């Protein structure tokens, strides 16, 4: 009798937990305000002051850039003069211009080698124009490049490279010269775009706004929500600030399994389960080895030494394994079981894809 009561209490607790609403999140984490976004800038420039690690003679455009720069300062080089030097590197400069930034403010820039420079460490980016997609100049970049990697090479040709020495950043390296206009202040309404489109989330956002401010929010699809806003710019900014603090129930999200095919990383969201399934998986490995045999002719035979290539191909068939799981098994437990058998990331991915094709995964499989 006591055990029956305990089982009833446990079942009631589980039902209560399942009936709880999804965790509410601030609206600022769910939506973007239309017209308030970053704008990408890009430019071409040169980095000088390198310790012999710049572009080699095969890169012609870096030498041409040096000649054009000297010409702007009134220095005309003789015709057919080779202006390619190893302490200069041609680079592409990119930056992200946040919304609302005004003239005189600074932003970080990323500097990346365009030629065959070995390292940008110790270099200085000369004044570079940063343009948007419309071709207009919005910022000017210049400064010392900060590199997180290194590269060293000995006289024998041996070298070592840590991280990426051909790309770096310049903190606060660009000054804003032109503001990007925004349509945030225009019209009698604002638009909110869900970062992850969902009909349920869009409906919950509209209900939450209308519950607090009256019938001012509408939606037509799973992404865009239109909200009537004050016409005065100061009041509109304060209104959006209040909206961003409002908590909204996002609803139930689709369970996902994300697999990175390059690194073998598997990320499993909460709620992913597997239906009854059995999987048999075997591994096939092909090994190709190359070696060279030297054929030496006999003395006084007027023959020549020949190098004969020798290729060996081996095919190894691994022992197949059978896996069987009951209904409702956690996918995390399944992957742990497969990993304990010594399976590689490719094996895990093959099993996940097979389960997904069989309709055994209660969730969405995403491969990146």
From Swiss-Prot:
Q: What name does UniProt use for this protein?
A: Flagellar P-ring protein 1
Task performed by this protein: Assembles around the rod to form the L-ring and probably protects the motor/basal body from shearing forces during rotation.
Which Pfam family, an example, fits this chain? Answer: FlgI
Q: How does it associate, per the subunit comment?
A: The basal body constitutes a major portion of the flagellar organelle and consists of four rings (L,P,S, and M) mounted on a central rod.
A GO biological process of this protein is: bacterial-type flagellum-dependent cell motility
Question: What keywords sit in the KW lines?
Answer: Bacterial flagellum, Periplasm, Signal
Cellular localization per UniProt: Periplasm; Bacterial flagellum basal body
User: What GO molecular function annotation could you give as one example from this UniProt entry?
Assistant: structural molecule activity
May I ask which residue range the UniProt record assigns to the signal sequence? 1-24
Q: Which family does it belong to?
A: Belongs to the FlgI family.
A cellular-component GO term for this protein = outer membrane-bounded periplasmic space
Q: According to the lineage, what is the superkingdom?
A: Bacteria
Q: Does the keyword Signal apply?
A: yes
Indicate whether RNA-binding appears among the record's keywords.
no
